[in-house]
Amino acid sequence: MDWNRVEGNWKQMKGKVKEQWGKLTDDDLDVINGKREQLEGKIQERYGYEKDRTKKDIDDWYGRQGW
């Protein structure tokens, strides 16, 4: 997985992230700024997910982006 693609295109990706994880706020997305670790932490915080589930959900979401 090449997370640099997400990070490098964060402005475009924010909408897709928000579609998947609607509890994330615009402020959350600004703080995340494309950083996977920040995204994992905010998803865990907003949804109460365990770390393993969060990582799997992000991997699944990334895989559906068609890269």
UniProtKB/Swiss-Prot annotation:
Name the InterPro entries for this protein: CsbD (IPR008462), UPF0337_stress_rsp (IPR050423), YjbJ (IPR026042), YjbJ_sf (IPR036629)
Q: Which organism is it from?
A: Agrobacterium fabrum (strain C58 / ATCC 33970) (Agrobacterium tumefaciens (strain C58))
Coiled coil stretches, renumbered? none
Q: Family, per the entry?
A: Belongs to the UPF0337 (CsbD) family.
What top-level branch of life does the organism fall under? Bacteria
* Family annotation (Gene3D superfamilies): YjbJ
Q: What is this protein called?
A: UPF0337 protein Atu4724
Which is an annotated Pfam family here?
CsbD
